Amino acid sequence: DLFQNYSADCLPLGDQDLITLKMGVAFRAFNSIDQVEGTLTANIWLRHWWRDGNLIWNPEDYNNITEMAVNTEPGGDSSIWVPDIYLYNTAEKPMEQLDYSRAHVYSDGYIIWSRPGIIKSTCTFNLRSFPYDTQHCPFKFGSWVYHDGQMNLTLDEGSIDVSNFQENDGWNMADFSSKLNFVKYTCCPELYPDITLNVTLERLPGYYTLNIITPAYATSSLMIISFLVPWDSGERISFAITVMLSLIVFLLILS
């Protein structure tokens, strides 16, 4: 009977003035880092914690049941209200590949909801120091509907979890940070909170050093050595031409 008069379309305030939503992200892996397209695809678990004032019960009245798993799919049977958190800087349809997993509801009304899935964000890559470059990619999350007078968006302690992160072959996650922002948009008079997660990526240059830089330097050095060959030797010109052709072929392969 908890869901008899329950509406998943209304803020479940109960005795609260506004919903306090804690957020966190567990990074599992970076599936794709596309520097040409300017996108970063990540496998994540998007975590939410809040209190639903309309889902509180006395366990003694329900066979000592203290928690239950409930549906979060919009329009589903016994579906509960869930926060509409979107990735603002998405590179595709917002949150399309995040699963509407079941949420854990406790008898005191507190809810834990973890959404596994794939997100694709935009990222501006600065390749001036390639291949010894460091990139900074943001993930900006926030509610699409609720402003700061309706939802108190907060950072969970340890909001970024990388304990189960699978390292990328070409990149290293060097650092990460999170920041809570309040932004006033031209459409609306209220402030809208968002949480921006900043990920710092360091390129692993070993492959490029071994396969590009070292051969290029070696070939260029041979060109200098050609000047040590006696000028009246017929092999000097043929040696220089051979080195030049080798360098051209190498550059064609790289392109």
Region roles according to the model:
Residues 1-241, 253-255:
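Non-transmembrane, solvent-exposed beta-strand/loop segments in proteins
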Residues 244:
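Winged helix-turn-helix DNA-binding recognition segment
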Residues 247-253:
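Aromatic-anchored segments of alpha-helical transmembrane domains
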